[in-house]
């Protein structure tokens, strides 16, 4: 899809061998599994020496702040935040919650890139994640 291609382009443009990609909201869309290398794929980030880790949300849908703190390392270069629930049962993330998460992450590692997959986000609020600290926002195109 166009969104997956935009996400892949943003990831591959900002990550280098030895870098780590972190998802603090659990597993991404299945279309990204091959891009990241969760499912082996030719040309994946994993094939280029980029590692991936994720921190699942807590059972009540809240962020696992302790888990996120422990998952941020020196080589964590980019944090990807999927706004839409996708195929999960969690609620869609509000811009306010995304802002709280980005603030928490940037307080730990100010130079990390926070990228938001804003799929369907334009239908629910009048603010965008860029207004609350996101460095990159994806919605079928890169902003």
Which residues fall in each region the model found?
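Conserved PLP-enzyme active-site core in the AAT-like
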Residues: 2-143
């Amino acid at each position: 899809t166009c969104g997956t291609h935009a996400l892949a382009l943003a990831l591959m443009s900002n990550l280098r061998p030895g870098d780590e990609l972190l998802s603090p909201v659990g597993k991404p869309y299945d279309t990204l599994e091959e891009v990241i290398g969760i499912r082996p794929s030719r040309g994946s980030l994993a094939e280029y020496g980029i590692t991936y880790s994720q921190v699942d949300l807590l059972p009540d849908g809240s962020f696992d702040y302790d888990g996120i703190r422990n998952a941020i390392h020196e080589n964590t270069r980019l944090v990807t935040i999927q706004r839409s629930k996708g195929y999960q049962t969690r609620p869609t993330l509000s811009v306010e919650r995304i802002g709280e998460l980005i603030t928490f992450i940037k307080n730990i590692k100010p130079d990390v890139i926070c990228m938001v997959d804003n799929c369907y986000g334009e239908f629910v609020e009048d603010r965008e994640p860029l207004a609350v600290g996101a460095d990159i926002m994806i919605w079928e195109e890169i902003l």
